[in-house]
Regions:
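Predominantly soluble domains enriched in secretory-pathway, periplasmic, or organellar proteins
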Residues: 1-182
Length: 182
């Protein structure tokens, strides 16, 4: 349901978005479009003015959220199954690149805590792998990824207001992992 918050009334309803349990939404820089990441692996681009689905794709078997680059050109989905992230062109939802979360040979992790950083970068946690990864999409089809140890089961993450530090709560132990992204 789309709501006009100034008038406090619903103005449209958009269906066909898949499994929305634990879904998340990010918005284009001009706030015209919303990108909905569904639990069923669906990624939907919505036109909020036209109240319609522009495009919907099934990009994984089980997704948990996503983010959009600071310039608004890249939408990234974080996935449980298969573990990893996928980057898409924000206009067309064309797949640009995939970064599998293979933390050891043949071992893949659920990805959680995805957050956008300056310079077309994204930070995220590998729940099963105990790591934080930082992927640079300055060349969207050839991302470069750095890996950092994080502790047991890093989970939800966020970036500090100055954009410098990425923090991930540790589900498997008492504590918080902090990565200086500069």
């Amino acid at each position: 349901t789309l709501v006009d918050t100034s008038r406090r009334e619903a103005y449209a309803r958009i269906g066909g978005l898949g499994d929305l349990s634990h879904a998340s939404v990010v918005y284009s820089r001009d706030a015209r479009y919303a990108y909905v990441f569904g639990r069923d692996g669906g990624l939907s681009k919505l036109d909020l003015l036209g109240a319609r689905v522009v495009k919907r794709i099934l990009q994984s078997g089980n997704a948990i959220g996503g983010s959009i680059s600071q310039d608004g050109r890249i939408v990234v989905a974080q996935n449980y199954t298969p573990g990893g992230i996928k980057a898409f062109d924000a206009d067309t939802l064309e797949l640009l690149a995939e970064v599998p979360a293979e933390y050891a040979p043949g071992a893949f992790s659920k990805v959680v805590g995805l957050a956008d950083l300056s310079g077309q970068r994204f930070a995220y946690a590998l729940f099963d792998g105990g790591e934080i990864w930082l992927s640079d999409f300055s060349q969207p089809r050839q991302p470069k990824t750095l890996r950092f140890p994080a502790g047991q089961q890093p989970y939800d993450g966020l970036v500090t207001p100055d954009g410098r530090h990425y923090l991930a709560g540790l589900f498997g132990e008492d504590g918080v992992a902090m990565l200086d992204t500069w």
